[in-house]
Swiss-Prot record:
Coiled-coil portions: none
Summary of subunit composition and partner proteins: The cytochrome bc1 complex contains 11 subunits: 3 respiratory subunits (MT-CYB, CYC1 and UQCRFS1), 2 core proteins (UQCRC1 and UQCRC2) and 6 low-molecular weight proteins (UQCRH/QCR6, UQCRB/QCR7, UQCRQ/QCR8, UQCR10/QCR9, UQCR11/QCR10 and a cleavage product of UQCRFS1). This cytochrome bc1 complex then forms a dimer.
Source organism (scientific name): Microtus arvalis
Additional notes on this entry: Heme 1 (or BL or b562) is low-potential and absorbs at about 562 nm, and heme 2 (or BH or b566) is high-potential and absorbs at about 566 nm.
Upper taxonomic lineage: Eukaryota, Metazoa, Chordata, Craniata, Vertebrata
Protein name as catalogued: Cytochrome b
């Protein structure tokens, strides 16, 4: 068996990735989220595949087909709610995974980090298009509002929007192409994940100290396979509690009303995992400025290696930057809350303040804190 594992052309790739992979001996549970994201992706692809067998991407029947899945298909309600809430679990793991990367300075592995940002954009695009498919009120108006943002692009904006819509409004052509893209993107994401892992295994994993751990490595199996399995059990338990007891808690009641182009919902808002970016978008009165801020709120992650001023990699031994980091986390929670509130006083000013704070902390305060900590170390 050992010979096959190490010599077979296909099996040895798996062996070098998940079995004999040298891993730091001190990585904590914050390193579990990579495998949990893999699990989420598998769950989403499988549940999505079964949903696609019964779903019809036509404006006349899309809403009814989702109702049919929930009422008439064996365990259709479970598959549908697992898929909807699986997206939420996916984003919870994603945000924690990115947050871990920022905290422990994993962005210094530039290829892995940049591929992660590409993955983040791909997952966000997939989730957005998936939200349109049930063809409820929030699906329709969410698609209208978000795609309309492209009209802010000078000169070609309006043409681009109509090209994406396949007409002069969000209609049958839009729904059909969104379904096609929503189906294909997870497989593209799977390929990107393999590239992400390829880059990671070129450098090896980071660890909580931020120091080089080449002198102290252990095999991935059995140590981290068992550790990851515990994470999997906890995630599945949380996931099934959410799906079976509170399936609609993260959804919008408006999406149980069929799409009606003649009736606008009182508050158009995306799913909870986009609210922080939506709040940044709304905080700028200018349309193009808002769109640029929205894109920059994610793209700014790519600049983190350039903004790293400290002599230390991780925040483990850097209390000043740690404080900045947790203020940033609190700020993102405020932005998420604001994104779900109506555009009126005092929410407008809170959103604008939180948006300014978001960019200021990353671009100004965290690099300055790093330099101050360098000076403190030099005093010793």
């Amino acid at each position: 068996m050992t010979v096959i594992r190490k010599k077979h052309p296909l099996i040895k790739i798996i062996n070098h990735s998940f079995i004999d992979l040298p891993a730091p001996s001190n990585i904590s549970s914050w390193w579990n989220f990579g495998s949990l994201l893999g699990l989420c992706l598998i769950v989403q692809i499988l549940t999505g595949l079964f949903l696609a067998m019964h779903y019809t991407s036509d404006t006349a029947t899309a809403f009814s087909s989702v109702a049919h899945i929930c009422r008439d298909v064996n365990y259709g309600w479970l598959i549908r709610y697992m898929h909807a809430n699986g997206a939420s679990m996916f984003f919870i793991c994603l945000f924690l995974h990115v947050g871990r990367g920022v905290y422990y300075g994993s962005y210094n592995m530039i290829e892995t980090w940049n591929m992660g940002i590409v993955l983040l954009f791909a997952v966000m695009a997939t989730a957005f298009m998936g939200y349109v498919l049930p063809w409820g009120q929030m699906s329709f108006w969410g698609a209208t509002v978000i795609t309309n943002l492209l009209s802010a692009i000078p000169y070609i904006g309006t043409t681009l929007v109509e090209w994406i819509w396949g007409g002069f409004s969000v209609d049958k052509a839009t729904l059909t192409r969104f379904f096609a893209f929503h189906f294909i993107l997870p497989f593209i994401i799977t390929a990107l994940v393999l590239v992400h892992l390829l880059f990671l295994h070129e450098t090896g994993s980071n660890n909580p100290t931020g120091l080089n751990s080449d002198a102290d490595k252990i095999p991935f199996h059995p140590y981290y396979t068992v550790k990851d399995f515990l994470g999997v059990l906890i995630l599945l338990m949380a996931f099934m509690i959410l799906t079976l007891f509170f399936p609609d808690i993260l959804g919008d009641p408006d999406n149980y009303t069929p799409a009606n182009p003649l009736n606008t919902p009182p508050h158009i808002k995306p799913e909870w995992y986009f609210l922080f970016a939506y709040a940044i978008l709304r905080s700028i009165p200018n349309k193009l400025g808002g769109v640029l801020a929205l894109i920059l709120s994610i793209v700014i992650l790519a600049f983190m290696p350039l903004l790293h001023t400290s002599k230390q990699r991780a925040l483990t031994f850097r209390p000043i930057t740690q404080t900045m980091y947790w203020i940033l986390v609190a700020d993102l929670l405020v932005l998420t809350w604001i994104g779900g509130q109506p555009v009126e006083y005092p929410f407008i000013i809170i959103g604008q303040t939180a948006s300014i704070a978001y960019f200021t902390i990353i671009v100004i305060f965290m690099p300055i804190a790093g330099m101050i900590e360098n000076d403190i170390m030099d005093l010793d």
